[in-house]
């Protein structure tokens, strides 16, 4: 009976899967990658020193999993926010936790990943996603008795004004330019004042939309 030949493409695919599995097994755990030496303020795994501006927070504040590890069920359903958001924005910014996956190799279960529904500047996203910067030392847990007051928000009425007349000098210049080009239009020139919608600089990016973060997480 003839031996069945294995197609080269199947062998290549099997080799690719084996390499991917080895890379996954050799990948450093979160507890290794984001461990901090609090005396030298460096990350032992990479040898990089934390930014100077982060030193005070590293000594006083907590990482997200440090807070959640003290709670039943790792705080599922609770609200968490960041100190930087409290300083930067008057509108409520927080995550409502939907899933937590701690790194069980960490000594105090203070590393891992978390997912939640983001509310940023009063606007709530429709789907849960992975929370970024969980290793930063600036997370705050919203007390249960303060959640209702913390999430209360009345959005300001949007400005419906779309355009305004040009100043007299600019209006005269535009009309003169029209006449020079042979334009006989009698339409009044108007200046568009609609704002361009842009995400704030500290809006949490989706993990699938960005590459591997560069620099030293704090």
UniProtKB/Swiss-Prot annotation:
Cite the record's Basic and acidic residues compositional bias ranges: 196-212
Q: Which family does it belong to?
A: Belongs to the mitochondrion-specific ribosomal protein mS34 family.
Tell me the protein's name: Small ribosomal subunit protein mS34
What does this protein's UniProt record list under function?
A: Required for mitochondrial translation, plays a role in maintaining the stability of the small ribosomal subunit and the 12S rRNA that are required for mitoribosome formation.
Principal location: mitochondrion
Q: Which GO terms describe its molecular function?
A: structural constituent of ribosome
Residue ranges, annotated region (Disordered) = 180-218
Q: Which superkingdom does the taxonomy of this entry point to?
A: Eukaryota
> What gene is this protein translated from?
MRPS34
Compartmental location? Mitochondrion
